[in-house]
């Protein structure tokens, strides 16, 4: 909401509740002129035909971990952990690790107006983060990258955590803590 209002303060943006089918039905019933849903979710549900426009990441940075799937299992079940290890996508793991480290370092929750996008390009982990006021009239951004080449998997995870913390520190220096507090107080 905050990112949309930051770009288009002339819009009336409302929250919408329910699962994807419920939200689409509300759109079809004329309750809304448009709705914004995660592209990855619509694709996963086989609803690609409902996508009419994809908002570029330069306009709206996704929520932390957007589009990534996680699998949980018992920590003490070595066999299941070994089976699941083959499902792990190392690039997704390292990007989500960085994004979550940023969110954790900001002490922000899932409802805070915070966006993050990590990607691996040419052996470097790039991370972009944004924090906005609840109404989107104030915004702070940060981006950085770190080389992953020739690092072990655990070293890559440590590097991703460090990158997320670095981005958070930059955002905090720019006033992110106050923006998050203001958004939390007005929620």
What are these regions (language model features)?
Residues 2-4, 8-187:
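Small-molecule-sensing regulatory modules
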């Amino acid at each position: 909401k905050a990112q949309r209002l930051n770009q288009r303060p002339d819009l009336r943006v409302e929250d919408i509740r329910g699962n994807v089918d419920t939200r689409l039905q509300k759109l079809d019933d004329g309750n809304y002129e448009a709705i914004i849903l995660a592209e990855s979710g619509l694709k996963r549900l086989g609803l690609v035909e409902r996508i009419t426009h994809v908002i570029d990441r330069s306009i709206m940075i996704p929520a932390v971990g957007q589009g990534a799937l996680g699998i949980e299992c018992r920590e003490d079940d070595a066999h299941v952990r070994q089976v699941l290890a083959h499902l792990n996508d190392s690039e997704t793991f390292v990007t989500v690790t960085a994004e979550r480290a940023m969110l954790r370092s900001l002490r922000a929750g899932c409802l805070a107006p915070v966006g993050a996008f990590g990607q691996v390009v040419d052996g470097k982990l790039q991370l972009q983060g944004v924090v906005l006021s609840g109404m989107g009239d104030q915004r702070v951004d940060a981006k950085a990258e770190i080389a992953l080449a020739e690092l072990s998997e655990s070293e890559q995870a440590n590097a991703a955590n460090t990158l997320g913390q670095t981005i958070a520190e930059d955002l905090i220096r720019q006033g992110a803590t106050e923006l998050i507090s203001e958004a939390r107080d007005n929620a």
